[in-house]
Amino acid sequence: MGCDDKCGCAVPCPGGTGCRCTSARSGAAAGEHTTCGCGEHCGCNPCACGREGTPSGRANRRANCSCGAACNCASCGSATA
């Protein structure tokens, strides 16, 4: 998985320490577990407007997290598809 705004990384990813998405693999069959440097899972919404505990609808669903009603950051703005 590449770095993106959902993980708090610069887009496009500059590489090196500027990119905070890291992957830890524990075997090829185990798949890939991706986290940000701050400990958040990539794909979740780290923006300051916060999260809702339960997705309020399919449009706001983002993996295991969801964007709050007041969210308008880049991660949430693309959640309308």
Swiss-Prot record:
Family: Belongs to the metallothionein superfamily. Type 15 family.
Superkingdom per UniProt: Eukaryota
Sorted UniProt keywords: Metal-binding, Metal-thiolate cluster, Zinc
GO molecular function: zinc ion binding
Pfam family, one: Metallothio_PEC
UniProt name for this protein: EC protein I/II
Iron in keyword set: no
Organism name: Triticum aestivum
Keyword Zinc: yes
Function: Binds 5 molecules of zinc. May have a role in Zn(2+) homeostasis during embryogenesis.
Disulfides per UniProt: none
Induction details: By abscisic acid (ABA).
